[in-house]
C-alpha cells in the first residue's frame, strides 16, 4: 500500500511540476505579450509623429510650389507686357513705312494730268493750226480765182469784184482768231472738252471753204453775164 501511495505521491509531484512548468510558460507568454504592446506603442507613436512631420512638409512643399508657380506666372505676365509695347512700336513703324509708299502714287497721278493737259493743248493747237491752214489755203485759192477773173472782166468790174473779195477775205482772217483764243481754254479743260473743239474747228473750216466757193461761183456768174 505504501508503495502505491508513494507512486501516487510521486505522480502528484510530477503532475505538480508539469503544471508548474505549464503555469510558468503561460505566465512567460503572458508577460511577453504584455511587453510587446508596450514596446509597439512607442513605435506607433514615433510612426505617427513621422507621418505628421511628412504631412506638414508636404503642405510646405505644395505652398512653395504654388508660390513658385505664381512667381513664374507673374514673370511671364511682365514679359508679355514688355513684349507687347515693343510689338506696338514695331507695328506703328511698319504702318508708317507702309503709309509713305502710297504717297508717291497721288503725286504721279497729279503729274499725269499735267502731261495729259499738255498733250491736249498741242492737240487743240494743231486743230486751230489746221483750221487756220484751211482758211489760208482757201484765201490763196480765192486770190488765184480772182486773178484769173480780173483779166477777163473790165476795170470797174474788177474793182467791184475785188471789194467783195476783200470783204470775204477779212472774215476768213478774222475767224481763226476765236480758234486761237480757244487754245488756252482747251488746255485748261479736260480731255473730253479738248476733244470737242477739235472736231468743231474742221467744222468751222468747212463753212469757210464753202464761202469762198460760193464767192467764186458768184464771180464766175458775173463774168459770164458780162
UniProtKB/Swiss-Prot annotation:
Lipid attachment in record (N-myristoyl glycine): 2
Glycyl lysine isopeptide (Lys-Gly) (interchain with G-Cter in SUMO2) cross-link, renumbered residues: 25, 86, 159
Tree of life domain: Eukaryota
GO cellular component, one term: nuclear speck
Keywords per UniProt: Cell membrane, Cell projection, Isopeptide bond, Lipoprotein, Membrane, Myristate, Phosphoprotein, Ubl conjugation
Record field: compositional bias (Low complexity): 106-140, 150-226
Biased composition (Basic and acidic residues): 15-27, 49-94
Cellular localisation: Cell membrane; Cell projection, Growth cone
Ranges of biased composition (kind: Basic residues): 1-11
Region span, Disordered: 1-226
Pfam families with a match to the protein in the record: BASP1 (PF05466)
One BP term from GO: negative regulation of DNA-templated transcription
Modified residues (Phosphothreonine): 31, 36
GO MF annotations, alphabetized: calmodulin binding; protein domain specific binding; transcription cis-regulatory region binding; transcription corepressor activity
Residues that bear Phosphoserine: 40, 92, 128, 131, 160, 167, 169, 173, 192, 218
Membrane association type: Lipid-anchor
Protein family per UniProt: Belongs to the BASP1 family.
Protein name (record): Brain acid soluble protein 1
Organism name: Mus musculus (Mouse)
Gene: Basp1
Amino acid at each position: 500500500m505504501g508503495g502505491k501511495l508513494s507512486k501516487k505521491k510521486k505522480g502528484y509531484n510530477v503532475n505538480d511540476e508539469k503544471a508548474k512548468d505549464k503555469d510558468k510558460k503561460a505566465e512567460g507568454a503572458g508577460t511577453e505579450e504584455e511587453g510587446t504592446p508596450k514596446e509597439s506603442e512607442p513605435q506607433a507613436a514615433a510612426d505617427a509623429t513621422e507621418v505628421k512631420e511628412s504631412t506638414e512638409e508636404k503642405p510646405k512643399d505644395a505652398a512653395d510650389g504654388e508660390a513658385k508657380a505664381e512667381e513664374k506666372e507673374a514673370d511671364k505676365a511682365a514679359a508679355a507686357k514688355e513684349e507687347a509695347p515693343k510689338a506696338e512700336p514695331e507695328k506703328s513703324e511698319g504702318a508708317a513705312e507702309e503709309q509713305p509708299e502710297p504717297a508717291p502714287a497721288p503725286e504721279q497721278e497729279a503729274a499725269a494730268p499735267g502731261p495729259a493737259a499738255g498733250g491736249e493743248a498741242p492737240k487743240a493747237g494743231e486743230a486751230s493750226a489746221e483750221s487756220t491752214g484751211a482758211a489760208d489755203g482757201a484765201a490763196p485759192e480765192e486770190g488765184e480765182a480772182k486773178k484769173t477773173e480780173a483779166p477777163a472782166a473790165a476795170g470797174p468790174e474788177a474793182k467791184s469784184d475785188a471789194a467783195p473779195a476783200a470783204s470775204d477775205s477779212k472774215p476768213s482772217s478774222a475767224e481763226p482768231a476765236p480758234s486761237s483764243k480757244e487754245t488756252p481754254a482747251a488746255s485748261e479743260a479736260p480731255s473730253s472738252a479738248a476733244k470737242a473743239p477739235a472736231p468743231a474747228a474742221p467744222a468751222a473750216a468747212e463753212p469757210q471753204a464753202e464761202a469762198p466757193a460760193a464767192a467764186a461761183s458768184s464771180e464766175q456768174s458775173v463774168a459770164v453775164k458780162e
